[in-house]
């Protein structure tokens, strides 16, 4: 079944053009089932592009999903029209009374700052605590993953001498994991970050299990059973051109940047990159949503009971 999103959301037409099944709010009402309620806390500067990336993966599920777009209340977005935010987004304060089957927390362009120096860190801490009582399962991505694993387990992030940037081979460390069902033994994942979390720090926490890792880029995906959380430190959701967009943006701004590793054909930035991670991105999100469906409560009000802070 398709993803349910507002009829006038810019992502609607983009997804239809790609062949992703989407459903109007009017049509969804006629289906006598409870759709999965998934929220996207979008911390990225270009919110519209990020909406499309995650809605594409969610919409490929055979289950009906209702997507709620959420933003930080006290933070002024610089790269997304205010009209778009007012039309399609709610602040966390406006949705915190609700319960959700799933929550995705995106990356944010603040990864070189200490967490405590991020202007909205206090609200992020409240959101993380809120997920324990109001969200069945959370997918934390890039900075969102680093922030969450630091908040819950004090696992630190470490700065890198140069940006981890490109497409890298990763290993499947847990073939029997429900989240890696159908995964190859090795696969490609886009990476774009200035910081990392380290295996040695994660291994100090008994509840954390490393599912995906790269010899060059280190830890990629961590599962925490106790809190129903996944920590994805890289960007499986990226479009084919996302790394190119970042590269040319930095080049235009005069920021020193290397070509993204193993990305442009023949390392020629005039050639169109091939997407070699799309199928595994769909597998990961499909498995996450399937597990969500299998384990969540039919009554949304029961989500989080007995899990508390």
From Swiss-Prot:
Gene Ontology CC, one term: cytoplasm
UniProt site positions, description: Important for acyl-CoA specificity: 111
Sequence positions that bind substrate: 163, 192, 249
InterPro entries: Class_I_gatase-like, HST_MetA, MetA_family
Pfam families the UniProt entry points to: HTS
Organism, as annotated: Allorhizobium ampelinum (strain ATCC BAA-846 / DSM 112012 / S4) (Agrobacterium vitis (strain S4))
Function (record text): Transfers an acetyl group from acetyl-CoA to L-homoserine, forming acetyl-L-homoserine.
Domain of life where this protein originates: Bacteria
Protein name per its UniProtKB record: Homoserine O-acetyltransferase
Pathway: Amino-acid biosynthesis; L-methionine biosynthesis via de novo pathway; O-acetyl-L-homoserine from L-homoserine: step 1/1
Positions of the catalytic residues: 142, 235, 237
Family: Belongs to the MetA family.
Keywords attached to this entry: Acyltransferase, Amino-acid biosynthesis, Cytoplasm, Methionine biosynthesis, Transferase
Disulfide-bonded cysteines: none
GO molecular function per UniProt: homoserine O-acetyltransferase activity; homoserine O-succinyltransferase activity
Subcellular localization, as worded in the UniProt entry: Cytoplasm
EC number annotated for this UniProt entry: 2.3.1.31
Single biological process term from Gene Ontology: L-methionine biosynthetic process from homoserine via O-succinyl-L-homoserine and cystathionine
Catalytic activity: L-homoserine + acetyl-CoA = O-acetyl-L-homoserine + CoA
Important for substrate specificity, annotated site positions: 192
């Amino acid at each position: 079944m398709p993803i349910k999103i507002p009829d006038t959301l810019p992502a609607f037409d983009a997804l239809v053009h790609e062949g992703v099944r989407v459903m109007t709010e009017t049509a969804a009402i006629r289906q006598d089932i409870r759709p999965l309620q998934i929220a996207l806390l979008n911390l990225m500067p270009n919110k519209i592009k990020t909406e499309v990336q995650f809605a594409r993966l969610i919409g490929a599920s055979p289950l009906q999903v209702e997507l709620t777009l959420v933003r930080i209340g006290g933070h002024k977005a610089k790269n997304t029209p205010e009209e778009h935010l007012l039309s399609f987004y709610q602040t966390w304060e406006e949705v915190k009374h609700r319960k959700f089957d799933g929550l995705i927390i995106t990356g944010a362009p603040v990864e070189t700052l200490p967490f405590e120096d991020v202007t909205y860190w206090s609200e992020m801490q409240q959101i993380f605590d809120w997920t324990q009582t109001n969200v069945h399962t959370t997918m934390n991505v890039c900075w969102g993953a680093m922030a969450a694993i630091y908040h819950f387990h004090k696992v630190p992030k470490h700065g890198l001498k140069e940006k981890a940037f490109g497409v890298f081979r990763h290993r499947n460390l847990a073939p029997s994991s429900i989240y890696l069902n159908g995964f190859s033994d090795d696969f490609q994942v886009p990476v774009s970050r200035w910081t990392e979390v380290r295996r040695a720090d994660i291994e100090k926490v008994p509840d954390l299990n490393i599912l995906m890792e790269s010899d060059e880029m280190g830890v990629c995906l961590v599962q925490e059973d106790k809190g129903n959380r996944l920590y994805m430190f890289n960007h499986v959701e990226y479009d084919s051109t996302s790394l190119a967009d970042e590269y040319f943006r930095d080049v235009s701004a005069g920021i020193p940047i290397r070509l993204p590793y193993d990305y442009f054909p023949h390392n020629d930035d005039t050639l169109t990159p091939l997407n070699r991670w799309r199928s595994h991105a769909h597998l990961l999100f499909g498995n996450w949503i399937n597990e969500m469906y299998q384990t969540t409560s039919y009554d949304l009000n029961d989500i989080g009971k007995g899990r508390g802070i």
